[in-house]
């Protein structure tokens, strides 16, 4: 369709004269218009053919860009760079994230110690070089799947391994720090509380038993901790250094505000060694001059005394108080017994014992003769006066005499004797009828006019 330039009437393209006003159309203009429409149509067809190619080319460009973006963040080299940057910049949180595994959570404080350990024991420049070379070799290798970075002394500090792929094209590199178990061995049952893996942790260690406190990555550690024992609560640190271990464990050094007590006794020469005790803060323990007692908290006073026995009587020292301000890691104290009081008592008891032993010597000399006469004559009356009537021993000897099973004895010796009220216990060494030397313990009762009678006996 075309419009008449004179009256505006619409007309077909092939009409040459306007039917309304008679205006004659220009045939060249119509021909040009037709040619132009055909060109436009041809160009449209060409454009429609080019669109798929343009879209495909655009998608290809996007894929190439995406590949390079993925490579920048996911290639082994890129993964290495992330770890290197974190260590170079002391980014402990990033290092903790990279090194944490399902089985071992690494917290930021551990990561901080680890970063410092790498810089001290490997050197940052050497570590970066070793890491890049290791990753490059693993990436190119078809057989190797893991390798270690080591310190100057040859200890493993980082395990680098291939762990599948990322986005099909790139090897996935895993960075894992090897771990060791720090171990404690307290002298008494101890509870330790500290922070590990970002969480509070409690470990209970039995006395004189090796106990691990967890798994830690390489480093030189000084961990704030609290420990509790029967003696009290202590604030301090648990210290351990991977440089000091060539095994799977590392010894822990305890650094707490504690006092250890060495005790010296004076005036105790007459006391039985096995009876000597030390009482610290109401807790009684056996005494040893070579033993150190503790540890005890340095922030609390300590009360201490000692006791011991001589001839059955207990003697004690005065109780001393050690002020908290005077407590040191190694604290010495001397406790004094009243030696004169002890010696006077021992002398008195020895006189009594000598008198008692003399009585017993006389008694058992007569008893052994009576016993043998009863055996030879099969007559209980010979020995009955030496045994208390109604006692189980009385009935037993009477039965043995009647059966002829009474044992003959000779050469009685008094080894030891003690008197408690009207009861006496005596250890007597005898020769039996087989000629063998035996020790027997007798219990006697002292009646009126100091008369002694046997109540019971037993083998020592």
From Swiss-Prot:
Its main location: membrane. GO terms for cellular component: plasma membrane. It is a single-pass membrane protein. Residues 1-49 are cytoplasmic. Signal peptide: none annotated. Residues 71-460 are extracellular. GO terms for biological process: response to antibiotic. It comes from the Bacteria. It holds the Pfam family TcaA_5th. InterPro entries: Mem_prot_TcaA (IPR023599), TcaA_2nd (IPR054529), TcaA_4th (IPR054530). A zinc finger (C4-type) spans 4-21. Keywords: Antibiotic resistance, Cell membrane, Membrane, Metal-binding, Transmembrane, Transmembrane helix, Zinc, Zinc-finger. The chain crosses the membrane at residues 50-70. It is found in: Cell membrane. Belongs to the TcaA family. Plays a major role in decreasing resistance to glycopeptide antibiotics. This is Membrane-associated protein TcaA. It comes from Staphylococcus aureus (strain bovine RF122 / ET3-1).
């Amino acid at each position: 369709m075309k419009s008449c330039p004179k009256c505006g009437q619409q007309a077909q393209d092939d009409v040459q004269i306007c039917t309304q006003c008679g205006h004659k159309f220009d045939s060249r203009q119509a021909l040009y218009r037709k040619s132009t429409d055909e060109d436009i149509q041809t160009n449209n067809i060409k454009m429609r053919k080019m669109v798929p190619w343009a879209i495909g080319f655009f998608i290809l460009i996007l894929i190439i860009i995406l590949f390079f973006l993925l490579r920048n963040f996911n290639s082994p080299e890129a993964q290495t760079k992330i770890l290197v940057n974190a260590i170079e910049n002391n980014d402990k949180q990033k290092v903790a994230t990279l090194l944490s595994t399902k089985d071992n959570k690494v917290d930021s404080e551990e990561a901080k110690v680890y970063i410092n350990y790498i810089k001290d024991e490997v050197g940052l420049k050497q570590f970066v070089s070793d890491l890049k070379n290791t990753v490059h070799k693993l990436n190119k290798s078809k057989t190797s799947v893991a390798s270690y970075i080591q310190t100057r002394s040859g200890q493993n500090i980082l395990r680098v391994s291939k762990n599948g792929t990322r986005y099909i094209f790139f090897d996935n590199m895993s960075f894992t720090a090897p771990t060791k178990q720090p171990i404690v061995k307290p002298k008494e049952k101890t509870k330790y509380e500290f922070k590990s893996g970002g969480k509070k942790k409690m470990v209970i260690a039995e006395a004189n038993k090796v106990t691990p406190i967890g798994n830690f990555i390489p480093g030189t550690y000084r961990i704030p901790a609290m420990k509790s024992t029967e003696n009290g609560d202590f604030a301090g640190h648990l210290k351990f250094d991977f440089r000091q271990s060539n095994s799977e464990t590392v010894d822990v050094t305890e650094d707490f505000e504690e006092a250890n007590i060495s005790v010296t006794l004076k005036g105790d020469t007459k006391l039985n060694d096995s009876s000597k005790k030390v009482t610290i803060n109401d807790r009684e323990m056996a005494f040893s001059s070579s033993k150190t007692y503790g540890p005890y908290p340095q922030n609390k006073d300590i009360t201490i005394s000692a006791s011991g026995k001589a001839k059955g009587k207990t003697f004690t020292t005065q109780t001393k108080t050690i002020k908290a301000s005077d407590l040191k890691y190694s604290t010495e104290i001397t406790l004094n017994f009243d030696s004169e009081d002890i010696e006077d008592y021992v002398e008195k008891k020895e006189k009594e014992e000598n008198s008692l032993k003399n009585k017993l010597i006389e008694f058992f000399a007569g008893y052994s003769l009576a016993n043998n006469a009863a055996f030879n004559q099969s007559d209980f009356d010979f020995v009955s006066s030496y045994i208390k009537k109604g006692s189980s021993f009385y009935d037993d000897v009477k039965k043995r005499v009647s059966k002829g099973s009474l044992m003959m004895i000779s050469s009685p010796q008094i080894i030891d004797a003690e008197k408690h009220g009207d009861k006496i216990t005596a250890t007597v060494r005898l020769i039996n009828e087989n000629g063998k030397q035996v020790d027997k313990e007798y219990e006697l009762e002292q009646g009126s006019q100091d008369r002694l009678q046997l109540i019971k006996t037993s083998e020592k």
